[in-house]
């Protein structure tokens, strides 16, 4: 990994909002979110009682995999793709370890995202493998459409990791920022039978056409002052100044119609969270709210055990990763970052409470 990382223009951490806020193809309204769904399965099981499940890679070959961070390449759908892989000291090739898929934001790219989330370093301490893949396009992004080549790549990436490393397939998780949070939502849908839990940061979404075979526990984070993916729904002003996805040098706002530029299209974060709760079989009553810091409220939806759905709402928070010192250092780009909670710590504790229950696969 290069030792110097440029942050100018970093970027457009939230812009793929354009793909969901400016068209009806990537989000679904809460009112019809269950229209084509089967009833989600929920299992109330003590997480400590869920055994580790060895991936096909467990054995002598996995034991020889180098620890630490490497940049890996692979082919998916005929395309050359790459990703960063962080193998923790705890990986011995025979004892399965958890895996976290960590997805970058629009124009952010995998290298910057390593700094933003800090999950690779955090994973070394906690004992999980971290995969940080690169998206596609002149302006790196993810196509969140179900069945897209990007989703195929991520499925192939999980297959590759599980065949090369000793992974606990009951403890495979996904997180991401902004467009990476959009993709986190899509991954949780398309790979519903292998993703144990999800943690979108600054961009939870409902995905059009998604049907759940099982409930997917979800913990989300979003700032009320986000100027990219706005809390109330739609494009923020800063999103309009982001680079267009075609690499033409134009701004995103230049590629939109006047109506699109002024529209507050797209569901609000509370509406999206309510839709996730509904998918997860939660009761149709108001969530409870608990102030856990001066600027952070934990919003807990009334869900059955094993289908928990939680939002950490950051008052005046920006398009940022809570607890990230890197995020805090680029306040001029992403807005305020709360340091009163740490998203890595919260999502990891949530993940460990929500392994994939074999009976619900």
Where in this protein do the model-derived segments appear?
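The feature captures the conserved acid-bearing segment of alpha/beta-hydrolase catalytic domains
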Residues: 196-294, 300-306, 316
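A domain-start/cap signature at the N-terminus of enzymes
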Residues: 22-97, 175-199, 205, 271, ...
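Extracellular low-complexity, Gly/Ser/Thr-rich intrinsically disordered linkers
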Residues: 310-311, 315-353
């Amino acid at each position: 990994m290069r030792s110097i990382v440029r942050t100018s223009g970093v970027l457009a951490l939230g812009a793929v909002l354009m793909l969901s806020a400016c068209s009806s193809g990537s989000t679904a309204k809460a009112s019809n979110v269950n229209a084509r769904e089967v009833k989600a399965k929920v299992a109330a099981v003590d997480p400590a009682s869920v055994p580790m499940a060895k991936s096909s890679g467990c054995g002598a070959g996995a034991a020889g995999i180098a620890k630490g961070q490497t940049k890996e390449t692979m082919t998916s759908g005929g395309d050359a793709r790459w990703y960063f892989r962080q193998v923790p000291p705890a990986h011995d090739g025979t004892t399965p370890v958890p895996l976290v898929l960590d997805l970058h934001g629009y124009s952010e790219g995998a290298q910057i995202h390593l700094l933003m989330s800090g999950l690779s370093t955090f994973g070394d301490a906690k004992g999980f493998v971290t995969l940080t893949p690169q998206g596609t396009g002149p302006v790196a992004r993810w196509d969140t459409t179900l069945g897209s080549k990007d989703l195929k790549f991520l499925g192939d990436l999980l297959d590759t990791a599980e065949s090369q490393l000793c992974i606990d397939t009951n403890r495979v998780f996904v997180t991401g920022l902004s467009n990476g949070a959009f993709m986190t939502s899509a991954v949780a849908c398309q790979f519903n039978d292998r993703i144990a839990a999800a943690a979108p940061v600054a961009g939870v979404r409902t995905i059009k056409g998604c049907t759940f075979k099982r409930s997917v526990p979800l913990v989300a984070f979003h700032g009320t002052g986000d100027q990219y993916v706005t809390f109330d729904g739609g494009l923020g002003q800063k999103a309009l100044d982001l680079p267009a996805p075609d690499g033409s040098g134009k701004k995103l706002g230049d590629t939109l119609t006047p109506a699109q530029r002024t529209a507050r299209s797209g569901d609000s974060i509370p509406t999206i969270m309510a839709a996730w709760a509904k998918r997860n079989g939660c009761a149709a009553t108001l969530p409870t709210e608990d102030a856990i810091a001066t600027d952070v409220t934990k919003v807990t939806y009334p869900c059955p055990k094993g289908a928990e759905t939680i939002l950490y709402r950051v008052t005046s928070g920006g398009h940022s990763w809570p607890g990230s010192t890197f995020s805090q250092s680029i306040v001029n780009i992403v807005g305020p970052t709360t340091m009163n909670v740490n998203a890595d710590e919260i999502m990891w504790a949530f993940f460990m409470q929500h392994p994939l229950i074999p009976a619900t696969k």
